[in-house]
Amino acid sequence: YNIGNLQCPNAVLQHMSIPQFLGEGKPVVFVRKSESDYGDVVRVMTVVYIKFFVKTTKLCVDQTVWKVNDEQLVVTGGKVGNENDIFKIMKTDLVTPGGSKYVYKLLHCPSHLGCKNIGGNFKNGYPRLVTVDDDKDFIPFVFIKA
């Protein structure tokens, strides 16, 4: 989403499952760090880089990988292979209203620091993804194969 009329939009927003609000979520690809992880399945706590799977301009083609900026906001502009742009997926004990037990949380896990949950915060009126210090504070994610 383009906040601030940037040449390459870099905001990563939380998709709200409310009709008419921010449209549909955008598909992502999980790029595994290790070549030993084969197949289509990304296992929990595997080191991954998260990359939007969207059409983009030639100018912005390198602006699709997620990272955390100095304000602790999740933005694009990361690089696959950069140890600071590592994320992990962790299973939670939550259950969806429909009864699914496949509810996860995302962690940002730069190599030189411990992992932090990805939570939410409204910044300038937008539901932004941010790192949070409280282990119980996180946004639950449900993944749908695109």
Swiss-Prot record:
Its main location: other. It is found in: Vacuole. It holds the Pfam family Kunitz_legume. GO terms for molecular function: cysteine-type endopeptidase inhibitor activity. Keywords: Disulfide bond, Protease inhibitor, Thiol protease inhibitor, Vacuole. Inhibitor of cysteine proteases. May protect the plant by inhibiting proteases of invading organisms. Belongs to the protease inhibitor I3 (leguminous Kunitz-type inhibitor) family. This is Cysteine protease inhibitor 3. It comes from Solanum tuberosum (Potato).
